[in-house]
């Protein structure tokens, strides 16, 4: 499942090709995604210009503005689900069975420098159809109140996210710290791979009740979360099965994993065999010697 690093890699890959371009045509082939695609999406997006691409948690937010006077800006919310990708294509090759939406993008008044002339295609592909493409006309100031965004925790790269924040928001929580990280209500984007890796770097056993973490351990964990996610973004995310970036390239962070998917193999620090357990129906990996 694409997590924060994969979504951020996608966002950064789209920026130089998509921002400033005009949506010349929209093709929706399958509307039955996680939530039905707006039946009027083609009309709503027609001739709008993509002004910005932001990210909130695992959602991509494309701000689409109209050149018509008085028409408010809108936001295309994209969630990649478990197997979704957004690809930039120089032309529109014949679609496959899982290619659900195309945006044909023509050069616009503010197209980024260095992009190729002529039209390009932004294609959404999702074999399992757990992704989502939604339209919202909420003003930017009210966008955090969108039903899909309002319960999300702080961004891990927000300066306010630190050990003090983590310590304060885990008080009274009896759930295991890995479970709390995956829930996303305290901090977003720490998916299954990155939770195991962050907890290893912080020296914290994933079954530790969140409310029992000391301030010092929260300091280490907050730093480990930021470092792990930053490294994953630098490596293009993790490709375990389906994920590719906007240019079709796979991610390579999985090659750097210290404990994830290494059950029975020696810990890279102490050589103790890595253990695998199940928490909330998700596999967890840890070193019983390095993590307490």
UniProtKB/Swiss-Prot annotation:
Keywords: DNA damage, DNA repair, DNA-binding, Glycosidase, Hydrolase, Lyase, Metal-binding, Multifunctional enzyme, Zinc, Zinc-finger. DNA binds at residues 98, 128, 173. Binds 1 zinc ion per subunit. It catalyses: Hydrolysis of DNA containing ring-opened 7-methylguanine residues, releasing 2,6-diamino-4-hydroxy-5-(N-methyl)formamidopyrimidine; 2'-deoxyribonucleotide-(2'-deoxyribose 5'-phosphate)-2'-deoxyribonucleotide-DNA = a 3'-end 2'-deoxyribonucleotide-(2,3-dehydro-2,3-deoxyribose 5'-phosphate)-DNA + a 5'-end 5'-phospho-2'-deoxyribonucleoside-DNA + H(+). GO terms for biological process: base-excision repair. Disulfide bonds: none annotated. Monomer. Belongs to the FPG family. This is Formamidopyrimidine-DNA glycosylase. It comes from Cupriavidus necator (strain ATCC 17699 / DSM 428 / KCTC 22496 / NCIMB 10442 / H16 / Stanier 337). The lineage of its organism: Bacteria, Pseudomonadati, Pseudomonadota, Betaproteobacteria, Burkholderiales.
